């Protein structure tokens, strides 16, 4: 692998020239879905400028991890995550960090590839302070309870039909036009009894 180097203006111009005209698009997931489908979920600060690998056109951000919520076994003997990797072009779903506040903490949910943390623009990356208290409770403790049995089932158009008793119908985008609606900010899809999952409030579980 070629060494990473600071992302210079010339590289930015090159990426802009060769980038396809159509940008990457994806449907933001419910936070529980993001947690369950990720290999690693951490809280971290972005502390360095992006560096690009000129051969692979991947870039990496230096981060300082402050908390890990998922991935202890997947990470193995590695005690820390120092970098997060992403495609260098937004058109192929590369994540571009907009904040210049290096003291701000972010919730990062990503995939591990060869021991490296990878994210895209479709990954769940959000300022920790922007999460509701219920979402923080979900990431720190509760979402994991629903990962094995339960599935958040997106409803994007009418009619919506559940395919299983273990599915919870997610209607935020249909009813409110945003993935940041009530179900996303305050509820988790959790087992009620064997073979049945329901939306349950996270607010009532906050100590």
From Swiss-Prot:
Changing residue 121 to L: Decreases protein flexibility and increases affinity for MMP14. Residues 24-27, 90-91, 179-180 are annotated as: Involved in metalloproteinase-binding. Transmembrane segments: none annotated. Residues 1-23 form the signal peptide. GO terms for molecular function: cytokine activity; growth factor activity; metalloendopeptidase inhibitor activity; peptidase inhibitor activity; protease binding; zinc ion binding. InterPro entries: Netrin_domain (IPR001134), TIMP (IPR001820), TIMP-like_OB-fold (IPR008993), TIMP_C (IPR027465), TIMP_CS (IPR030490). Gene3D superfamilies: 2.40.50.120, Tissue inhibitor of metalloproteinase-1. Chain B, domain 1. Keywords: Disulfide bond, Glycoprotein, Growth factor, Metal-binding, Metalloenzyme inhibitor, Metalloprotease inhibitor, Phosphoprotein, Protease inhibitor, Secreted, Signal, Zinc. Glycans are attached at residues 53, 101. Disulfide bonds join 24-93, 26-122, 36-147, 150-197, 155-160, 168-189. Its main location: secreted. The keyword Oxidoreductase does not apply. Detected in rheumatoid synovial fluid (at protein level). Residues 24-147 form the NTR domain. Changing residue 25 to E/G/K/Q/R: Reduced interaction with metalloproteinase. The modification Phosphoserine is found at residue 178. GO terms for biological process: cartilage development; cellular response to peptide; cellular response to UV-A; connective tissue replacement involved in inflammatory response wound healing; negative regulation of apoptotic process; negative regulation of catalytic activity; negative regulation of endopeptidase activity; negative regulation of membrane protein ectodomain proteolysis. The record marks 57, 158 as: Involved in metalloproteinase-binding. Zn(2+) binds at residue 24. It is found in: Secreted. Belongs to the protease inhibitor I35 (TIMP) family. Metalloproteinase inhibitor that functions by forming one to one complexes with target metalloproteinases, such as collagenases, and irreversibly inactivates them by binding to their catalytic zinc cofactor. Acts on MMP1, MMP2, MMP3, MMP7, MMP8, MMP9, MMP10, MMP11, MMP12, MMP13 and MMP16. Does not act on MMP14. Also functions as a growth factor that regulates cell differentiation, migration and cell death and activates cellular signaling cascades via CD63 and ITGB1. Plays a role in integrin signaling. Interacts with MMP1, MMP3, MMP10 and MMP13, but has only very low affinity for MMP14. Interacts with CD63; identified in a complex with CD63 and ITGB1. This is Metalloproteinase inhibitor 1. It comes from Homo sapiens. The lineage of its organism: Eukaryota, Metazoa, Chordata, Craniata, Vertebrata. The gene is TIMP1.
């Amino acid at each position: 692998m070629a060494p990473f180097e600071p992302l210079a203006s010339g590289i930015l111009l090159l990426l802009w020239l060769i980038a396809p005209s159509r940008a990457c698009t994806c449907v933001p997931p419910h936070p529980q879905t993001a947690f369950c489908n990720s290999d690693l979920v951490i809280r971290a600060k972005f502390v360095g400028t992006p560096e690009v690998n000129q051969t692979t056109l991947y870039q990496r951000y230096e981060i300082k991890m402050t908390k890990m919520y998922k991935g202890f076994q997947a990470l193995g003997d590695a005690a820390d995550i120092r970098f997060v990797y992403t495609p260098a072009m937004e058109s192929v779903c590369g994540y571009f960090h907009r904040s210049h506040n290096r003291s701000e903490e972010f919730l990062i949910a990503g995939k591990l590839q060869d021991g490296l943390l990878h994210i895209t623009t479709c990954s769940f990356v959000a300022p920790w302070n922007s999460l509701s208290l219920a979402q923080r409770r979900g990431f720190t403790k509760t979402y994991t309870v629903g990962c094995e049995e339960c599935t958040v089932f997106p409803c994007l158009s009418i009619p919506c039909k559940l395919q299983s008793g273990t599915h919870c119908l997610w209607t935020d985008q249909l009813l409110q036009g945003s993935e940041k609606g009530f179900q996303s900010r305050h509820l988790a899809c959790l087992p009620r009894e064997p073979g049945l999952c329901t939306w349950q409030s996270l607010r009532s579980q906050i100590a």
